[in-house]
Amino acid sequence: MIKIYLDEADQSHLTSISKNAATKPEWLRVKAPQFERIGNTASLLSDLKLNTVCQEASCPNIGECFASGTATFLIMGPACTRACPYCDINFDRSKRDLDPTEPHRLAEAVSRMNLKHVVITSVNRDDLDDGGASQFFQCVSEVRKKSPETTIELLIPDLCGNWQALELVLDSKPNVLNHNIETVKSLYRKVRPQGNYQRTLDLLKRTKEYFPSVYTKSGFMLGLGESDDEVLNLLSDLKNHFVDIVTIGQYLSPGPKHLPVQRFVSPPKFTYFKLFGEDNLGFMQVVSSPLTRSSYHAEEIQKLMKKYPR
């Protein structure tokens, strides 16, 4: 039976849906960024010709993260070979060569920024035989050389179900392997037409089976038309496929050509899903709030690694 931790006064918010989903509620407003500190991070990234998912995907937390000197690096170019209708990253299906200098430049950025924890992600590169696995491997290797104390989190695509490519990624020995499931099963064809719900779950399970000591992570969005029961079932599926950490955030439509927001989920509802995941299912951590994104405050994983050493 699900434990309920919310006061009666908060219960009414659990199923509240905005009548005008185009109008953001108060809790989705972000603080004005500190432009000087943002400029320092942006300048460094520009000098080293590096992309970030913060910029390419129009993340609402870019001000906070850049101001604190952190960023999620986006490797293998700023354009994706898929055109998911929720995503703001550019689309390009053409075959493109990888830049062999990218791993070195990324490692230099990590060193200059003195990062204790780095998140490396990529666009989908379905034009590559290994989906970009070898580039992930090289990036981890170069970061380890220049910053051996830095913990590394990889946020990878599904690699088209190429399990040999997945093993190559895992052979680089990241501290955290993240692959986002993004939405509930019933919405997959609509939200991720080139993805596959079960393939994502299989990737997460195979990750833990091949590399048991890695911390596994996945995330998804609310507000695309899912029901609360579907969210609970999704959390159960992730737990049954050996996921340690989950992130849950509000979907925000990038523009009129993208999927519209179906509802704005209130903060108490996010808390409800967090407590269900941690207390009922036993996840190591569920980070759940309207502005949560998969790499938001990712550096806090180091606290979990100390609490749950492997």
Curated annotation (Swiss-Prot):
Catalytic activity: [[Fe-S] cluster scaffold protein carrying a second [4Fe-4S](2+) cluster] + N(6)-octanoyl-L-lysyl-[protein] + 2 oxidized [2Fe-2S]-[ferredoxin] + 2 S-adenosyl-L-methionine + 4 H(+) = [[Fe-S] cluster scaffold protein] + N(6)-[(R)-dihydrolipoyl]-L-lysyl-[protein] + 4 Fe(3+) + 2 hydrogen sulfide + 2 5'-deoxyadenosine + 2 L-methionine + 2 reduced [2Fe-2S]-[ferredoxin]
Listed EC numbers: 2.8.1.8
Pfam families listed in its UniProt record: Radical_SAM
PROSITE patterns attached to this UniProt entry: RADICAL_SAM
Highest taxon above the source species: Bacteria
This protein's UniProt keywords: 4Fe-4S, Cytoplasm, Iron, Iron-sulfur, Metal-binding, S-adenosyl-L-methionine, Transferase
Cofactor comment: Binds 2 [4Fe-4S] clusters per subunit. One cluster is coordinated with 3 cysteines and an exchangeable S-adenosyl-L-methionine.
Pathway recorded for this protein: Protein modification; protein lipoylation via endogenous pathway; protein N(6)-(lipoyl)lysine from octanoyl-[acyl-carrier-protein]: step 2/2
Protein localization: Cytoplasm
GO CC annotations on file: cytoplasm
All residue ranges annotated as the Radical SAM core domain in the record: 66-284
GO molecular function: 4 iron, 4 sulfur cluster binding; lipoate synthase activity; metal ion binding
SUPFAM superfamilies registered for this protein in UniProt: Radical SAM enzymes (SSF102114)
Main location: cytoplasm
Cofactor: [4Fe-4S] cluster
Enzyme class, spelled out: transferase
Coiled coil spans: none
Binding site for [4Fe-4S] cluster 2: 80, 84, 87
List of residues binding [4Fe-4S] cluster 1: 54, 59, 65, 295
NCBIfam families named in the record: lipA, PRK05481.1, PRK12928.1
Family the entry assigns: Belongs to the radical SAM superfamily. Lipoyl synthase family.
PANTHER family: LIPOYL SYNTHASE (PTHR10949), LIPOYL SYNTHASE, MITOCHONDRIAL (PTHR10949:SF0)
Protein's recorded name: Lipoyl synthase
Organism expressing this protein natively: Prochlorococcus marinus (strain MIT 9215)
Gene this chain is encoded by: lipA
